[in-house]
């Protein structure tokens, strides 16, 4: 708990130093207006370092993508308003996993996109994949 508190406190300071809002979203996470996912992850990594910890050793970054909100006509909007294919999405996840030492990804694809889940599970082995919406929304399974 102490580690989380210190990292979150430093993350708040870094966000404020950039002149961004430290307002929080529905689930308690910061929701600054930033230009990219990488910018958000860079801020988190900086906060981890500023707190005296090592990303991937002392602290693990986990993502809750909530991909149901990013899904339209078998494509995903991961970076912007443009949509990319499942294969390109998986490539992006792999880049992010490597660069930021991601340990877990929750809801990386829409709950009904079985092909995407299957492809991801076959191609990413060392990261925990969590299907929150997949299981909680599909109670008939």
Residue spans for each PLM region:
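Conserved small/polar residues in nucleotide/adenosyl-binding loops
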Residues: 139-141
């Amino acid at each position: 708990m102490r580690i989380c508190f210190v990292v979150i406190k430093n993350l708040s300071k870094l966000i404020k130093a950039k002149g961004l809002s430290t307002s929080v979203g529905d689930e308690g996470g910061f929701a600054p207006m930033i230009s990219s996912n990488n910018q958000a992850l860079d801020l988190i990594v900086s906060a981890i370092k500023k707190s005296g910890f090592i990303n991937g050793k002392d602290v693990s970054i986990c993502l809750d993508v909530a991909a149901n909100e990013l899904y339209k006509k078998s494509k995903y909007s991961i970076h912007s308003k443009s949509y990319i294919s499942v294969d390109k999405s998986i490539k992006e996840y792999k880049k992010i996993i490597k660069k930021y030492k991601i340990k877990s990804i929750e809801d990386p694809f829409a709950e009904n996109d079985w092909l995407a889940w299957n492809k991801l599970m076959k191609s990413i082995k060392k990261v925990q994949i969590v299907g929150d919406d997949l299981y909680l929304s599909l109670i008939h399974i």
